[in-house]
Amino acid sequence: HGWRSVQWLEQLERLDAAVAGLARRVPAGTRIILTADHGMVDTGPDRRIDISARPALAHDVVAVAGEPRFTHLYVPGSDQDAASEVAQRWRDELGERALWIGTRAEASQHLGPVGQRAAGVLGDVLVAMSQEWVVVDPRVHSESAIVMPGVHGSITPAETTIPLLTTLT
């Protein structure tokens, strides 16, 4: 369910009641801290870009991984020239629907230092989507992942601004 759904609101109300119950049970002067690991955006069918249906996007991509909001693309032999060509083609195709598209080599310039362990799993090309856009590939993603309305993973403020609620009993 997306974060604007009735189901989402019902879960927030349950959480609110649980925190209120916790606040009644802990000793006076206890600080309760509630946070999340990421924000969310809602998407829909009109915001899905299907790689398998777009030959220009599928060309020279041998594997797809990551989140629909932050997709990792792999090119044959991890060739840097091929990665640069794929990145440019994706920039041309997606335009403003992508927040950032770059090669693994460019990732540290945009995302900060990339450790050795992370560098080993990063795609040859990284695609961070903007607004409510997602990249899907039914050859890789399950149907439930493709139709999921509430998504995260990109580097938009809605996804990286983390809520932090505190109260002192």
Q: What kind of region is each of these model predictions?
A:
Residues H1-T169:
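Feature captures the catalytic ectodomains and active-site-proximal regions of enzymes
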